[in-house]
Design a protein with these regions (language model features):
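Beta-propeller blade-edge signature
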Residues: 1-2, 100-102, 179-180
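Binuclear metal-ion centers of metallo-dependent hydrolases, dominated by the metallo-beta-lactamase
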Residues: 4-8, 81-98, 174, 191, ...
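Pre-active-site segment of Zn-dependent metallo-hydrolases
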Residues: 6, 10-49, 53-61, 131-176
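Active-site neighborhood of phospho(di)ester-bond hydrolases with catalytic His/Asp-centered motifs
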Residues: 21-25, 40-54, 70-75, 126-130, ...
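Active-site environment of divalent metal-dependent phosphoester hydrolases
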Residues: 27-31, 49-54, 77-80, 95-97, ...
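Active-site HxH/HxHxD metal-binding segment of metal-dependent hydrolases
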Residues: 33-97
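Structured loop/turn residues at beta-strand edges in well-structured enzyme cores
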Residues: 39-40, 102, 178, 206
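Metallo-beta-lactamase
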Residues: 70-125, 237-247
Length: 250
């Protein structure tokens, strides 16, 4: 089983029987097309409607691959980024779906849409989508019940309430499972001090075999490697991704 980094939050998981593509946005190095030529069932996941996690170009893949299943978050349809008939499966938080190859659970997010748990061929995979403790750097100055204006987000935010929501989502995930073989999670240096906090809180609550950073395209590969210090402390493998198209055996 291999995992290939495409760009931003997009990965391709190839198993013996199938190919899973998560949160396709851009493919600057043309890594995806060879996967579309393989004679395996193709599953395409999109966690939410944001353009950096969903690109309706994925529907063009039907013309190049006969055996394809689209599993999309319902918010994509709600925000009119796709038509109802475009996806084979629409899921919101709490939804599940399965066939003979894989089982899927849609869990919550602190942004739009969902995060994914996927079980296939003996592995349990987690893709966070935009689930994270995004306002971590504001927590030291935050007061309960009060908002802070954030220039970068251009809105009033409540860091304490947001963290409470995030930790609540983790509790909901623990109702399904307490362990993952592979976790793909945002480690985004743009959000400033504390940008690893969400990842640290995740690995404190789950047994993780391998931690894979994502969502770091604006802050750079090396910024994501900061998380390795914390995974090393817990004996968790960490993928130091260095380029688009890089593949790892998992």
């Amino acid at each position: 089983m291999t995992l290939t980094y495409i760009f931003h939050s997009c990965f391709v998981l190839e198993t013996e029987k199938s190919i899973l593509i998560f949160d396709y946005w851009l493919d600057l190095n043309g890594v995806v097309p060879p996967f579309l030529k393989k004679d395996k069932h193709l599953y395409v996941f999109s966690s939410h409607f944001h353009e950096d996690h969903f690109n309706n170009a994925i529907f063009e893949w039907r013309k190049r691959h006969e055996n394809i299943t689209y599993i999309l978050s319902k918010d994509i349809y709600k925000h009119r980024r796709a038509n109802k008939e475009d996806a084979d499966v629409w899921l919101a938080k709490g939804g599940t779906w399965a066939d003979d190859t894989l089982s899927v659970w849609a869990l919550g997010s602190t942004e739009s849409g969902v995060s994914w748990i996927v079980e296939t061929e003996g592995k349990r995979i987690f893709h966070a989508g935009d689930l994270n403790n995004w306002y971590a750097r504001f927590l030291p100055e935050a007061m309960p019940g009060e908002t802070i204006y954030s220039e970068e987000f251009d809105e009033e935010i409540d860091p304490i309430a947001h963290e409470k929501q995030y930790l609540g989502e983790l509790k909901d995930i623990r109702k399904i499972t307490e362990s993952f073989d592979v976790v793909m999670f945002p480690i985004d240096g743009r959000i400033g001090n504390g940008y690893t906090l969400g990842g640290r809180q995740f690995i404190e609550r789950f047994k993780v075999g391998m931690f894979v950073p994502m969502h770091f395209v604006a802050s750079g590969f090396e910024s994501a490697w900061r998380m390795k210090e914390f995974t090393d402390e817990k004996g968790i493998s960490f993928w130091e991704i260095r380029k688009e198209g890089e593949t790892l055996e998992i």
